[in-house]
Each structure stands twice: as structure tokens, then as C-alpha cells.
């Protein structure tokens, strides 16, 4: 099986937990992280030995070395951040909750279908 090259959007507590989980999976490689500023992206990347460090979510979403992105931001930002990544052609894992209401979830799934990427 090919390795999935992951990016993590956000650098908070849930991002740390996800990075730890990825570290034990044989078919996953943590390639990039994105934050709203370079300092937090660098600190997260140092902790998890990540090469690509992005000072914006937009930059992470367009990283050609990333196949899938885990959205680790507050619930209220899940829709915007997930759609940003989906529009860039990335598979997205966004959870707990996917969105803050059904309308947002439907919009997210609509973009995923339109772009033919996994959500």
C-alpha cells in the first residue's frame, strides 16, 4: 500500500494527538503543518520532525507534497478550512464535529463531490 502524505492544519492539542497517532501508522507520513504564524508552525514541526512548515492555511492547502489534510481547528472554522483544502484537491479528515450545523456539512460534502476528493 502506498503511504499517505499528511498535512495537519492547526497546531493545538488535537493536532498533537493526531500527530502522535500518525507516528505509529506504517502507511502514513506526516509531511507538513500549517498555522496562522511561522513561530507556531516551526514549533509544531520541530516536535514532530516535519519538514514543510507553512505560516498560512492557504499555503498548506496548496502544498504539492501533501495528499490529505487533518483539520485541527476550532469547530467554528471547520467548514471554511475544510473547503479551502477540498478546493485545492486535498482529501480532508475533519471530525468532532464535522461542522456546526447540517447546512455547513452539506456544503462541505457538495464541494468534496464536485472536486472528487474524500471528506
Report each predicted region and the residues it spans:
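N-terminal Rossmann-like dinucleotide-binding module
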Residues: 1-48
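Low-complexity, intrinsically disordered short peptide segments enriched in small/polar/basic residues
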Residues: 1, 11, 63, 114-115
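Basic phosphate/pyrophosphate-binding loop/patch that engages nucleotide-derived ligands
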Residues: 110-118
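Structural signature of beta-strand start/N-cap positions in the alpha/beta core
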Residues: 5, 29-30, 49, 65-68, ...
Amino acid at each position: 500500500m502506498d503511504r499517505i502524505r499528511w498535512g495537519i492544519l492547526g497546531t493545538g492539542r488535537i493536532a498533537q494527538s493526531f500527530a502522535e497517532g500518525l507516528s505509529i501508522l506504517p502507511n502514513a507520513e506526516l509531511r507538513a503543518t500549517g498555522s496562522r504564524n511561522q513561530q507556531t508552525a516551526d514549533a509544531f514541526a520541530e516536535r514532530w520532525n516535519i519538514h514543510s512548515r507553512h505560516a498560512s492555511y492557504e499555503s498548506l492547502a496548496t502544498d504539492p507534497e501533501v495528499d490529505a489534510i487533518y483539520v485541527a481547528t476550532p469547530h467554528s472554522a471547520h467548514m471554511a478550512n475544510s473547503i479551502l483544502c477540498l478546493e485545492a484537491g486535498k482529501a480532508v479528515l475533519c471530525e468532532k464535529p464535522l461542522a456546526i450545523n447540517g447546512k455547513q456539512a452539506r456544503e462541505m460534502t457538495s464541494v468534496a463531490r464536485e472536486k472528487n476528493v474524500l471528506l
